[in-house]
Amino acid sequence: MKILIDNNIIFSYSLFKKIGKVNLINSIDINAKNISGFDALIIKSSTNVNENLLKNSNIKFIGSATSGKDHVDVDWLKKNKINFDFAPGCNSVAVAEYVFSSMLYFAYRDKFSLLKKTVGIVGFGNIGKCLNKKLSAIGVKTILCDPILEEKNNIKLKSLNEIVQNSDIITLHVPLTYSGKYPTWHLINKKILLDLKDNCILINTSRGSVIDNNSLLNILKEGKPIRVVLDVWENEPLICSKLLSLIDIGTPHIAGHSLEGKIKGTISIFNSLCNFVGKKNKKYFISSFIDPYEIEYISMKGRIDQSKIYLLSLLSNNILYDDHELRKNFNKKNCFVNLRNSYRKRREWSSLFIKSNNILFSNLLNKIGFNSKFFKEK
């Protein structure tokens, strides 16, 4: 089997060579000509997979080492009997930590307690559930909106309008869809944006077009007092410089780019291709690919508070650094793509080992994703 793989998919060569002959390729060079002669194509979300790419190819398997699939024409693949798989949930922890870190930053900067705020989570899939678990662990009030889940499980959640009316912070975790009963394209439109509470924090880590970026730009120009975090943008990688200049935090679609999340995606697609070709494979663990965190342990004493959690989060991921890099390099050629492809080896909170002399503090840290143990002082 000949396998063509995006060269930014971490540890892909060492795994996929167990199945067949591997060629690595830059994502910008993935086209109809260059995939000729290959049996399997392994990609990221930057590659659009459709009839134009595949119609004259011999590809029998497409694997996307990503949690989403809106870059893939799944219906066309089914029609043409091309097997497809992706890695839902692989980056759920990373995105949830990015969003939580954003909230902690605003709480620190603007001097408020998250315990006095209501967080509206729009979309209650893998990421929404992970984030909700972390926020609930520290006592933050959350309200949920997911009409598809609501109908499927016959449960009562909130409508989008109720989320807008009652939330101090709104975070979006929906796929990008254009049709059906609940399309999400421009879900957050001009009317919704105007209806947001003053000083509301709006966070988008889902897909750029879930928010009408032009309407967002205009209401920010007009002085609407909201705070905005965008990791995803309309027309990526050609994002709007004016919009970037008006929001609080802007990053180049890297919310899910933790080292652990990337490895989960690679392992997931490797397992899928093994199943497709009927090859038995051993179970791989993330720890097989990652060295221990560079800090052996962190010792903390006393009671837990919001500021301590924020400081711990900075050791793993300072999103202000990513914001700074995007603004600093914005005018460079292929800035957005290059920042994504050369992204630092960001670790998840679980990589931090924390010794605490407070058992309640230690238990709480574990609930929100850190690796903590209680040590009784002698």
UniProtKB/Swiss-Prot annotation:
NAD(+) binds at D146, D231, G256. GO terms for cellular component: cytoplasm. Gene3D superfamilies: 3.30.1370.170, NAD(P)-binding Rossmann-like Domain. The keyword Cytoplasm applies. Substrate binds at S45, T66. One of its GO terms (molecular function) is 4-phosphoerythronate dehydrogenase activity. Keywords: Cytoplasm, NAD, Oxidoreductase, Pyridoxine biosynthesis. It catalyses: 4-phospho-D-erythronate + NAD(+) = (R)-3-hydroxy-2-oxo-4-phosphooxybutanoate + NADH + H(+). Its EC number is 1.1.1.290. InterPro entries: D-isomer_2-hydroxyacid_DH (IPR050223), D-isomer_2_OHA_DH_cat_dom (IPR006139), D-isomer_DH_CS (IPR029753), D-isomer_DH_CS1 (IPR029752), D-isomer_DH_NAD-bd (IPR006140), Erythronate-4-P_DHase (IPR020921), Erythronate-4-P_DHase_dimer (IPR024531), NAD(P)-bd_dom_sf (IPR036291). The keyword Cytoplasm applies. Its main location: cytoplasm. GO terms for biological process: pyridoxine biosynthetic process. Pathway: Cofactor biosynthesis; pyridoxine 5'-phosphate biosynthesis; pyridoxine 5'-phosphate from D-erythrose 4-phosphate: step 2/5. The active site is at R207, E236, H253 (proton donor). HAMAP family: PdxB. Catalyzes the oxidation of erythronate-4-phosphate to 3-hydroxy-2-oxo-4-phosphonooxybutanoate. Homodimer. This is Erythronate-4-phosphate dehydrogenase. It comes from Wigglesworthia glossinidia brevipalpis.
